[in-house]
């Protein structure tokens, strides 16, 4: 037969469990503006019952918090990473397309630009066909041909500068990717050290998700998380250092 304090113990377990739930809710409110924070939930479970009455069977002993887990959906994470990768790709593409368009764009005031120079070149060529004996016409055509050569030289220089800037940006992006990958590798080890013992590394998982968010804005991202076990069913863990990317 349970002691006289049995009911008090049940009440105490309820107070302790719901205090944890309240603390978890307070933590959610406190981090409502924290970038990358994932809402957490205290999971409750009935404690092991005891058998005290032969006729009625077991009786409950209270409640306990079994874990505090994240309310996060991997499906939406993957969709976001895919969309963020596409957005980053097209933003960079648009940036360089705008630069190239600026180089080829005509200046209406100075009448300089790809279309203007070529149009004037062919006009002078047509005039030269009909008035080739006129020295001024010949000089005008020569001058326009020189302007075309000067324009092409300037165009080549500008495109080369864009290419060099692109190469430097690629190098910086590769370095950034390697840096993020190294941080993710460190977090993976820390998460494993906690969760292999049955814990939940919620805050560390948030940090890792933030890094993947950042990484997805630079390159395509695909993540896989799985447990490795040996033939006896024991959990194994291997976390090799990330492979550095190199610009080819």
Language-model regions, residue ranges each:
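Long, non-coiled-coil amphipathic alpha-helical linker/lever segments
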Residues: 145-195
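Intrinsically disordered, charged and Pro/Gly-enriched terminal/linker segments
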Residues: 177-178, 213-216
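Bacterial Type III/flagellar export signals at protein N-termini
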Residues: 1-141, 146, 153-154, 159, ...
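Periplasmic/extracytosolic POTRA-like scaffold domains at the N-termini of outer-membrane
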Residues: 189-209
């Amino acid at each position: 037969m349970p002691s006289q304090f049995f009911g008090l113990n049940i009440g105490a377990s309820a107070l302790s469990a719901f205090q944890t739930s309240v603390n978890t809710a307070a933590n959610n409110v406190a981090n409502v503006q924290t970038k990358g924070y994932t809402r957490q939930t205290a999971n409750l479970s009935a404690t092991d019952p005891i058998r005290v009455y032969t006729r009625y069977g077991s009786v409950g002993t209270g409640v306990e918090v079994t874990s505090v887990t994240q309310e996060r959906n991997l499906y939406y994470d993957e969709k976001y990473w895919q969309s963020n990768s596409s957005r980053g790709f097209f933003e960079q593409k648009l940036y360089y397309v705008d630069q190239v368009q600026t180089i080829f764009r005509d200046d209406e005031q100075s009448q300089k630009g790809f279309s203007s120079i070529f149009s004037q070149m062919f006009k002078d060529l047509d005039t030269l066909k009909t008035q080739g004996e006129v020295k001024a016409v010949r000089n005008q055509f020569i001058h326009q041909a020189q302007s075309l050569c000067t324009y092409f030289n300037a165009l080549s220089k500008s495109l080369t500068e864009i290419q060099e800037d692109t190469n430097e940006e690629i190098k910086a992006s590769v370095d950034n990717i390697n840096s993020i990958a190294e941080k993710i590798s460190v977090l993976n080890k820390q998460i494993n050290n906690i969760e292999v013992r049955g814990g939940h590394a919620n805050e560390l998982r948030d940090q890792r998700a933030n890094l993947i968010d950042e990484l997805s804005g630079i390159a395509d991202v695909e993540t896989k998380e799985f447990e490795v076990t040996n033939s006896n069913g024991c959990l194994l863990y291997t976390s090799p250092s990330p492979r550095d990317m190199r610009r080819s």
